[in-house]
């Protein structure tokens, strides 16, 4: 099993933590990660685009001129697609772009991105992230002590609200619970800052 250094909030190394190789030590499957990222990005699309077809455009109920005898081309409505102000043919309609991949694929993708972060030395383990009250300055001190100055995803245990509130005003810092972090969240971050309890949660969820 792989070992990573465990730090406290002051940046001091206190011990090491053992990681489960079945989750944090596999060969990353880039193809699966790609598929899951595309799926999750598709689910984020709003999908509210809409245009009016000829049945939705107002007006045009009357035939503009008689069928025969005028010398002009026959027309049934001034809201036909060939008219200015007419309906749009085959235009976009509101829809959901989301689709689900099998659970096995999603789990493999999570294991792959966690393993990649550990292999690239972009996985920082911290004993805990506990604050007496939501304080952005206190969270900034923790990041500085751990020499984290890039885009970071902080994974905390369920119920640690003060950590999330303390970090939300900091640029390039995102907070998620260990059980709900997505592949897209992890891929978007340069580094992961994970509490010891969150590591246990990840291993429980993906075991």
From Swiss-Prot:
Molecular function in Gene Ontology: rRNA binding; structural constituent of ribosome
Alphabetized Pfam families for the sequence: Ribosomal_L4
NCBIfam families according to UniProt: rplD_bact (TIGR03953)
Keywords: Ribonucleoprotein, Ribosomal protein, RNA-binding, rRNA-binding
Gene Ontology biological-process entries: translation
Taxonomic lineage: Bacteria, Bacillati, Bacillota, Bacilli, Lactobacillales
Homology family: Belongs to the universal ribosomal protein uL4 family.
Name recorded for this polypeptide: Large ribosomal subunit protein uL4
Gene: rplD
Record note on quaternary structure: Part of the 50S ribosomal subunit.
Cellular component annotations (GO), alphabetically ordered: ribonucleoprotein complex; ribosome
